[in-house]
Amino acid sequence: QVTFSRDWSP
């Protein structure tokens, strides 16, 4: 699962 906050984080 990837979430977009500051940058792409797995």
Curated annotation (Swiss-Prot):
Subcellular location: Secreted
Cellular component terms (Gene Ontology): extracellular region
Family annotation (PROSITE patterns): AKH (PS00256)
Modified residues (Proline amide): P10
Tissue spec: Synthesized in the neurosecretory cells of the brain, and transported to the storage lobe of the corpora cardiaca.
The UniProt record lists the keyword Glycoprotein: no
Keyword terms, alphabetized: Amidation, Hormone, Neuropeptide, Pyrrolidone carboxylic acid, Secreted
Record InterPro entries: Adipokinetic_hormone_CS (IPR002047)
BP GO annotations: neuropeptide signaling pathway
A GO molecular-function annotation: hormone activity
Residues with the Pyrrolidone carboxylic acid modification: Q1
Cystine residue pairs: none
Known function: The in vivo function of this peptide is unknown. Has no adipokinetic or hypertrehalosaemic activity in locusts. Has hypertrehalosaemic activity in the cockcroach P.americana.
Family: Belongs to the AKH/HRTH/RPCH family.
Protein name: Hypertrehalosaemic hormone
Native organism: Locusta migratoria
Lineage: Eukaryota, Metazoa, Ecdysozoa, Arthropoda, Hexapoda
